[in-house]
Amino acid sequence: MNRVVKSIVYGVGIVGFGYMTMKLTTPSPERVVNSLPPDLRASYEMNKKDRSQAEGVLRMIEDAKRNPKNLV
């Protein structure tokens, strides 16, 4: 029984250390965008705007599929 508990504690410690390391070293999406050069940031913002418009169209299509009576 002692070996099982010891193994669980070590396993949790290793996984916890890995998770903490990941959280501390991975930058947030905003930080990545802010670190981009101005031309790439402008391109990113333009693509983001295009994606939001496309998502709006897809949302309208999904709504039309759910409620076909509201099309007229």
Swiss-Prot record:
It comes from the Eukaryota. Keywords: Chaperone, Coiled coil, Membrane, Mitochondrion, Mitochondrion inner membrane, Transmembrane, Transmembrane helix. One of its GO terms (cellular component) is mitochondrion. It is found in: Mitochondrion inner membrane. Essential for the assembly of ubiquinol-cytochrome c reductase. It has a direct effect on the correct occurrence of the Rieske protein, core 4, core 5 and apocytochrome b. The keyword Mitochondrion applies. This is Assembly factor cbp4. Belongs to the CBP4 family. It is a single-pass membrane protein. Pfam families: CBP4. Signal peptide: none annotated. One of its GO terms (biological process) is mitochondrial respiratory chain complex III assembly. InterPro entries: Cbp4. The chain crosses the membrane at residues 8-24. Its main location: mitochondrion.
